[in-house]
Swiss-Prot record:
Subunit structure: Part of the 30S ribosomal subunit. Contacts protein S5. The interaction surface between S4 and S5 is involved in control of translational fidelity.
Start and end residues of each stretch annotated as Disordered: 1-46
InterPro entries noted in UniProt: Ribosomal_uS4, Ribosomal_uS4_bac-type, Ribosomal_uS4_CS, Ribosomal_uS4_N, S4_RNA-bd, S4_RNA-bd_sf
Name this polypeptide is given: Small ribosomal subunit protein uS4
GO biological process: ribosomal small subunit biogenesis; translation
Keyword Cell division in annotation: no
Assigned GO CC terms: small ribosomal subunit
Gene name in the database record: rpsD
Summary of the function given for this chain in its UniProt record: One of the primary rRNA binding proteins, it binds directly to 16S rRNA where it nucleates assembly of the body of the 30S subunit. With S5 and S12 plays an important role in translational accuracy.
Boundaries of every S4 RNA-binding domain copy: 94-157
PROSITE patterns assigned to the protein according to its UniProt record, in alphabetical order: RIBOSOMAL_S4, S4
Organism: Rhizobium leguminosarum bv. trifolii (strain WSM2304)
Keywords associated with the record: Ribonucleoprotein, Ribosomal protein, RNA-binding, rRNA-binding
Any GO MF annotation of the entry: structural constituent of ribosome
């Protein structure tokens, strides 16, 4: 297991939830956290604890984003007009690595970031190697020709555990996706309940 794969499953164990809906998640086999004290019964969380957990879960879901990076995304969401929690989800789902993951070009969001960083993807015909690159509605994301037959890509397309959401149009024969629109929370196919309003409360303390 790679260091990044281990980190991914550590997030699942820490949250006590299979946050990506993966069949191999260790929480499918046990309902306690990592480490020797993981089986201890957890006490009721304080309001702060509930808010912190919601933030950690959302931050972890998008590839265990660094706190500084996640806070900057939140700050932009807060500056925008409208509901901050909806803005936050929209910004996270507009990331290039998130779209590559949603389009089922790769099996995990961690793989999506690495896939983009290694230059396997173009946006509107231009190679982009920054996972946090923000896509706009109408942008066309394509796997580069030399990368379309990579095993990781071929395996991801056939994954039955998740579907492509309706705000992304995908042609898996050509390995091309169009980001149709910025989604709202209710549009996003999270396998577990995400509570971005609690993230807003956390940063508004």
């Amino acid at each position: 297991m790679s260091k990044r794969e281990s980190s991914k499953y550590k997030i699942d164990r820490r949250m006590g939830e299979n946050i990506w809906g993966r069949p191999k998640s260790p929480v499918n086999r046990r309902e306690y956290g990592p480490g020797q004290h993981g089986q201890r019964r957890k006490g009721k969380l304080s309001d702060f604890g509930v808010q912190l957990r919601a933030k950690q879960k959302l931050k972890g879901y998008y590839g265990d984003l660094r706190e500084k990076q996640f806070r900057a995304i939140f700050a932009e969401a807060d500056r925008r007009k409208g509901d901050t929690s909806e803005n936050l989800i929209g910004l996270l789902e507009s990331r290039l690595d998130a779209i590559v993951y949603r389009a089922k070009f790769v099996p995990t969001v961690f793989a999506a970031r690495q896939f983009v960083n290694h230059g396997h993807v173009t946006v509107n015909g231009v190679r982009v190697n920054i996972g946090s690159y923000r896509c706009k509605a109408g942008d066309v994301i394509e796997v580069r020709e030399k990368s379309k037959q990579l095993v990781i890509v071929l395996e991801a397309v056939s994954l039955a555990e998740r579907d492509v959401p309706d705000y992304i149009e995908v042609d898996h024969n050509k390995m091309v996706a169009t980001f149709g629109r910025v989604p709202t929370l209710s549009d996003v196919p999270f396998p577990v309940v995400m509570e971005p309003h609690l993230v807003v409360e956390f940063y508004s303390r």
